[in-house]
Amino acid sequence: MTEPGQTTHFGYRDVPLQDKQTLVNDVFHSVASRYDLMNDLMSGGMHRLWKDVMITTLNPPRDDQPFRLLDVAGGTGDISFRAAKASGAGFQATVCDINTDMLEVGRQRAVERHLDGQVEFVEGNAEALQFPDKSYDAYTIAFGIRNVPRIDLALKEAHRVLKPGSRFLCLEFSSVDVPGLAKIYDLFSFKVIPQIGRVVTGDAESYQYLVESIRKFPKPADFGEMMREAGFARVNWQVLSGGIVALHSGWRL
């Protein structure tokens, strides 16, 4: 329950905690139709390689063994589609996202890819999932958890819905740790990405928020501690591309 007067960050702004989700929703309503194109432009296509690392780490079964994936904040379906391609006939994914526009893009793409029988799309909140305890074989969230107002609640919910022996994977932007790269990365992030957003989507402000939100996300070690506090074991992370992103892993034992 939100305490009166509680605040959180929305990019570099402090906002009432209860207002953040609405503000985040407005961002993704604005960019949904061009979201995947913008990912390509902003990362120079690197997001595809990072997601490939995530799917390789997930290592879903390639036979007909049943495997249920919960892909949270996965609106356009990119992670679930990649996982389906790497899986066997027993694969089923639930894409859960709070944003209806992102989900609609995902549903259309699932039909186009003939994956609508394996990938379902459900509107839901990462902080209060509607799924039963111990019901999924894996949980993925890619570039989404930093937009959740109460990350601690989302992590506890992730732990709750996973079966014992199942894995949590979170792909998220991180802190550049290569000398010289940080300045270049900051220049590109703050000067170039919002302008790409303005040209492609007509919305520079949403991409300014996304850039700022990356800087406010916890360092890998701090996020790892949050995972442990939520109940995850064998917590670790893999830094990619000089620290631009990190793949976080934990297990429900």
From Swiss-Prot:
Keyword Iron: no
Binding residues for S-adenosyl-L-methionine: 76, 97, 125-126
Gene3D superfamilies the record matches: Vaccinia Virus protein VP39
Pathway(s) served: Quinol/quinone metabolism; menaquinone biosynthesis; menaquinol from 1,4-dihydroxy-2-naphthoate: step 2/2; Cofactor biosynthesis; ubiquinone biosynthesis
GO BP: aerobic respiration; menaquinone biosynthetic process; methylation
Domain of life: Bacteria
Class of this enzyme: transferase
Catalysed reactions listed for this entry: a 2-demethylmenaquinol + S-adenosyl-L-methionine = a menaquinol + S-adenosyl-L-homocysteine + H(+); a 2-methoxy-6-(all-trans-polyprenyl)benzene-1,4-diol + S-adenosyl-L-methionine = a 5-methoxy-2-methyl-3-(all-trans-polyprenyl)benzene-1,4-diol + S-adenosyl-L-homocysteine + H(+)
Keywords recorded for this protein, A-Z: Menaquinone biosynthesis, Methyltransferase, S-adenosyl-L-methionine, Transferase, Ubiquinone biosynthesis
Entry's Gene Ontology molecular function annotations: 2-methoxy-6-polyprenyl-1,4-benzoquinol methyltransferase activity; demethylmenaquinone methyltransferase activity
InterPro entries for this protein: SAM-dependent_MTases_sf, UbiE/COQ5_MeTrFase, UbiE/COQ5_MeTrFase_CS
Keyword set includes rRNA-binding: no
Coiled coil location: none
Catalytic activity, EC: 2.1.1.163, 2.1.1.201
Family designation: Belongs to the class I-like SAM-binding methyltransferase superfamily. MenG/UbiE family.
Protein function: Methyltransferase required for the conversion of demethylmenaquinol (DMKH2) to menaquinol (MKH2) and the conversion of 2-polyprenyl-6-methoxy-1,4-benzoquinol (DDMQH2) to 2-polyprenyl-3-methyl-6-methoxy-1,4-benzoquinol (DMQH2).
Protein name: Ubiquinone/menaquinone biosynthesis C-methyltransferase UbiE
Species annotation: Rhodopseudomonas palustris (strain HaA2)
